[in-house]
Amino acid sequence: MYKAKRTAAQKVRRCLGKYELGRAIGQGTFAKVRFAKNMETGDHVAIKILDKAKVQKHRLVEQIRREICTMKLIQHPNVVHLHEVMGSKTRIFIVLEYVMGGELHDIIATSGRLKEDEARKYFQQLINAVDYCHSRGVYHRDLKLENLLLDTAGNIKVSDFGLSAISEQVKADGLLHTTCGTPNYVAPEVIEDKGYDGALADLWSCGVILFVLLAGYLPFEDENIVSLYNKISGAQFTCPSWFSAEAKRLIARILDPNPATRITTSQVLQDQWFKKGYESPVFDDKYYPYFHDVYDAFGDSEEKHVKEAMEEQPTLMNAFELISLNKGLNLDNFFESDKKYKRETRFTSQCPPKEIINRIEEAANLLGFNIQKRNYRMRMENIKEGRKGHLNIATEVFQVAPSLHVVELKKAKGDTLEFQKFYQTLSTQLKDVVWELEDAAEDMS
């Protein structure tokens, strides 16, 4: 018989509480992001994983904790949703909404500028999300195309609040003082580092984004960082000829280098160009977040830590191994033609692999067999000695498809006829587990 286990790849499932972790989809200085699935609901999520030691070494505990608390304050259809926060002894896990449509930046990079109506739709969603955040005292401070994701319906989802600042942390002069953000999108007052209004700085970045959507390129670019900052501080940009007069007027009011005279978000919402086709999102914003899970995640209490586990999955059969199970194509059968009974057999099942292996164990125990089990492999030995010693049977569950498994039973020691009788009794007891047995004719050579 072809030995499936020699070539089949063993799958190992990495579990984090109720989540199954998948491939890495992002990597930063302090965090890795993995695709994951909620095993209870089947929903896909993204889990940001932070190393506690690295965070503590760089004295970023408070900043990361603030980021998490900030995201919990935000419940808006155009902002990436934070589901929950968990912790282990060594890591922090931030469970986020998984946004499947990619980055808005990629659309511009591959297709160039957008039509005005399409750009306006994205800008409307962005402004609505930003206005919502500001109303709750939350400022993004790093708005750029790369942080604007798209869902499957083509709607914006603002991501990455790693540089956000809560209004409670504003200094006595009522201004923020930390310089951050991406150079091409940053407001002049942020560059000057004299303190700035977070809402007005965010709006400047929104103006840069609108320009890029309509033009296909940045309004402020220069290889020399000093020259770039000079262009930003002086608002040295020119709108292309294809911009409508209304769009030019709005962009000029947003990209005003003087924050005291710059248009506000509430004024943008009343702008005639902006209001064209505008539909305010309807959603329930009566949300009162709790923060105890954030402190539990950063704490040292093992009782409140999430369980991490590596779980072996059934071996996955490839196409050649499946073909070898077909008696007509299996060359091993030529060498077994003189044997009355086969020393191995199998059946298929649509039950979960854990249920299959547990049911076999229960039935074998009732038939007087001792069991040794490891994941989806099992060795069964009859307590009573038979005609040729103790009957010993090796069993393994293989995965053929997500909901289809092959269960293989092989006689390792003992009498072949006793093995066949055992299998007939076992398959009868497992009739609700067995989907299809090998053809009865294949039980005889």
Curated annotation (Swiss-Prot):
Record's comment describing the protein's domains: The activation loop within the kinase domain is the target of phosphorylation/activation by upstream protein kinases. The PPI motif mediates the interaction with the ABI (abscisic acid-insensitive) phosphatases.
Pfam families according to UniProt: NAF, Pkinase
E.C. designation(s): 2.7.11.1
Reactions this protein catalyses: L-seryl-[protein] + ATP = O-phospho-L-seryl-[protein] + ADP + H(+); L-threonyl-[protein] + ATP = O-phospho-L-threonyl-[protein] + ADP + H(+)
Source species of the chain: Oryza sativa subsp. japonica
Cofactor(s) annotated in UniProt: Mn(2+)
Region (PPI): 342-371
Biological processes annotated in GO: signal transduction
Keyword set includes ATP-binding: yes
Record keyword Cell inner membrane present: no
GO MF terms held by the record: ATP binding; protein serine kinase activity; protein serine/threonine kinase activity
Residue ranges of every copy of the Protein kinase domain listed in the record: 19-274
Domain NAF positions: 309-336
Binding site for ATP: I25, G26, Q27, G28, T29, F30, A31, K32, V33, K48
Official protein name in the record: CBL-interacting protein kinase 3
Enzyme active site: D142 (proton acceptor)
UniProt keyword terms in alphabetical order: ATP-binding, Kinase, Manganese, Nucleotide-binding, Serine/threonine-protein kinase, Transferase
Protein purpose: CIPK serine-threonine protein kinases interact with CBL proteins. Binding of a CBL protein to the regulatory NAF domain of CIPK protein lead to the activation of the kinase in a calcium-dependent manner.
